[in-house]
Amino acid sequence: MILYLVRHGVAIDRADPKAPAEAQRQLTAEGIRKTRQAALGFRECGAKPDALITSPYVRAAQTAEIFAEALGFPLDKIRVSEALKPAENPADILRELSHARAKEVACFGHAPHLDLTIAHLAGTRAPFSELKKAGVVCFEQSARGKWELRWLLSPKLLRKLND
């Protein structure tokens, strides 16, 4: 299996007095634009996920929809998983993935949860990365079940791939 972990795009700042509840914060107009460009760059990487799974939080779901549109993935096939919420245990999404029949899966979530998931997949407890908003990391699972880091691309690099 190939696993892509995607952090949501730039959202309304939680410190903004007009910001809605945490789960309802949306992408900003700039966040939508930059996420769309990053999604097109992701497509240029040759990624062809046959499953998209998102956190139920609005900003992650919006990011998943933007990536789905760039990839030609049906919006109604995006799955929602509580295991991708910010405070969840990284092992929970991996258990869920173990039942997936997909060859390539893209999961959309949040920091620090995704950084903890990256560390977990790499076999360490302490996070060693900081996935940027609309950034993507790719892991591949070996025949023996070990996860191997293939690449990590910042949103800036993803956007350049589409230039």
What are the functions of these language-model segments?
Residues 15-19, 92-93, 151, 161-163:
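Short aromatic-enriched loop/helix-cap "lid" or pocket-rim segments at secondary-structure transitions
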Residues 2-84, 88-91, 114, 127-134:
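Active-site-proximal alpha-helix that buttresses catalytic centers in soluble enzyme cores
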